[in-house]
Amino acid sequence: MVLIHTSVGFFKRFSTSATPSTSSASDWKTQQTLFRVATEISSILLQRRNWITHLQYVKSKLPRSTLTSPVFLQILRETRKCPKTTLDFFDFAKTHLRFEPDLKSHCRVIEVAAESGLLERAEMLLRPLVETNSVSLVVGEMHRWFEGEVSLSVSLSLVLEYYALKGSHHNGLEVFGFMRRLRLSPSQSAYNSLLGSLVKENQFRVALCLYSAMVRNGIVSDELTWDLIAQILCEQGRSKSVFKLMETGVESCKIYTNLVECYSRNGEFDAVFSLIHEMDDKKLELSFCSYGCVLDDACRLGDAEFIDKVLCLMVEKKFVTLGDSAVNDKIIERLCDMGKTFASEMLFRKACNGETVRLWDSTYGCMLKALSRKKRTKEAVDVYRMICRKGITVLDESCYIEFANALCRDDNSSEEEEELLVDVIKRGFVPCTHKLSEVLASMCRKRRWKSAEKLLDSVMEMEVYFDSFACGLLMERYCRSGKLEKALVLHEKIKKMKGSLDVNAYNAVLDRLMMRQKEMVEEAVVVFEYMKEINSVNSKSFTIMIQGLCRVKEMKKAMRSHDEMLRLGLKPDLVTYKRLILGFK
């Protein structure tokens, strides 16, 4: 009786649609064949070293030479005690037996790797699962199909760590919440990875809450954990708490670095140098980046005494060689890449004011780009003028584009800056079109029409499209001032870019064109046809066209427009419509 029950249970796993009691004789035969094939493959895997050769003979016994998930799961159960063999067979089956694992098979093979301590292999197997499915599906399926709690905890920790290292802390927190509900604790490595991800995104409060959970779960903090906690405390300005932490015997170069940068940001340079001397006594070295931060803060606060002190230290540590031009260039460019524009600008000015040192052309470009990114527009303008005056050749076009973007970002830009923007654009360096549109709209709102026209003219020949609001304001201005030729040029530009304007702006153009009587009727018809093409018409558009066509005695065209208006359901109010009909008499 027991044997019969086992066979039935096995065959049920292999069956896709029918139960043993209702399946045909041929179905039973197929199930028995699959049972024997699974057992044969398991025996070969467990008993043969060169099992790949022997499996070639079994391949033909599989339906269409394809391994299915139920057969694989049976093999996995029988070979689980030899995890490396099971995992190698999994890879072999995908390559040679057309095996396409379902979520259950994937989860079970990950569990085999995790429970046997093959974490790198488990991580590799997890990656495609995590990359192609949602967090809820991944953790839900793992919870459903894993048989052991320990292996589930290990595998979910790997999932959490994967998300954290990818910078997706939201997904990492979702996995963490799921594990808490299951009363599972992530590994120390997973905790540290998620902490690091939260710190990187400046989520300090959440990070401290996570650390509290880590302590409650009995996870012992390691050096990386303490470094991250010290960094959080320093970012929050809680340097005294960091010193209390250090009094317990916890200290590292990273903790000292965080403290130095914390004091430096607050302008407490005496404390900075005291810490640096303490580090020297303990044979701990600050990095170039940390010295760069201190120098940048000293330059930002204009503390000449400490600027000289930091420079002397950097010379002593061989980070800076004040007389070497090539070294200066590299240092300035490195500081620019770090975003330390006050320090890089100070060294840049020193080099420019000296007679013996000549900077590379690329250094001017780096300086222009860094100042522009930090929204220090006035200083960026000075560097740009210096580049033009000295005839410097900057090959990196992104430097000029970043400068143009900075000029667009400046809400209180002067006329000089607006002229510079036009100059940069004419040289072929076009900023972000969204920002450019905002500048144009701002000029129009402030009624600085000449500046707006200059800006528009500078990009008219380029493949640049302003948004409809900015162009609409300028179009209405052209119509009010009678500059219909410019209005038509702008329309052609928009048409070429397959853009559109607000219907009110188009109506203003139609109205002005029709007021010219017969002179510009054809132009009005062309504009109107484009309006219909882009579905930017309303009742007023048709009214303007019909009245204008009636005035120039184009009665057939007027009637066609009238009929089209009615067909589209754009009939105006009764008073306007009666006035419109009078034009046909």
Curated annotation (Swiss-Prot):
Keyword Transferase: no
GO cellular component terms, A-Z: mitochondrion; plastid
Keyword Repeat: yes
One Pfam family in the UniProt entry: PPR
Source domain of life: Eukaryota
Keywords carried by this UniProt record: Repeat
PPR repeat segments: 152-186, 187-221, 222-247, 252-286, 287-321, 324-358, 360-394, 396-431, 432-466, 467-501, 502-534, 538-572
NCBIfam families: PPR
Protein family according to the UniProt entry: Belongs to the PPR family. P subfamily.
Name under which the protein is recorded: Pentatricopeptide repeat-containing protein At4g21170
